Amino acid sequence: MTKTEARAQAKALRKNLDLHAIGAAMTQQLFALPAWRQAGTVFCFVSMRDEPDTTAILQQALVSGKRLCVPRCLPGNDGRMELVEITSLNDLQPGRYGILEPCGRTIAALEPGALALIPCLAVDKQGVRLGRGAGYYDRFLTRFGQTGPKLLLCPEALVFPALPTDEWDVPFTPGEILTENGVK
């Protein structure tokens, strides 16, 4: 299977998933984890319509007094993002691709120990992440070098036996995949 075929299969499967319910279950799983409770800073993607909903995660991070950073896509076609700290969900406005993006202060790097929550279209049991194909999160993870825990948020139905990979794909390891049923 090619990456293009895998993306098509993942997108087709997603259409039949209740992503709101899956997002709510993932959120409850996340809040029970020591990595969440211990994190002073959380980096989290702002979900699109076809992703598990991260709104409750963003809200709880703010209510809990955690420093919250979200990505902002940079202009151009080179798949770069920057980190932006927000202090309210009102700091989010529609940006590139119609994704809510922050209008807050850009920061240079995540502090050591920050928890990073990363999206995907699918993942395999070995931790190979399949994204949308632009390389935004592979570049992000390489550029910012994650020194704290990272979790890939993926519906259980999209954990495949195997996926194609390239040398630039940043792998995840067992224990770094969070589904609605817990950590894999």
Walk through the language-model features, giving the residues of each:
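N-terminal active-site beta-alpha-beta segment that forms phosphate/nucleotide-binding
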Residues: 1-111
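Receiver (REC) domain switch-region micro-motif
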Residues: 42, 116-117
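Short, well-ordered strand-loop elements centered on a beta-strand within folded domains, enriched
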Residues: 78-85, 128-130, 181-184
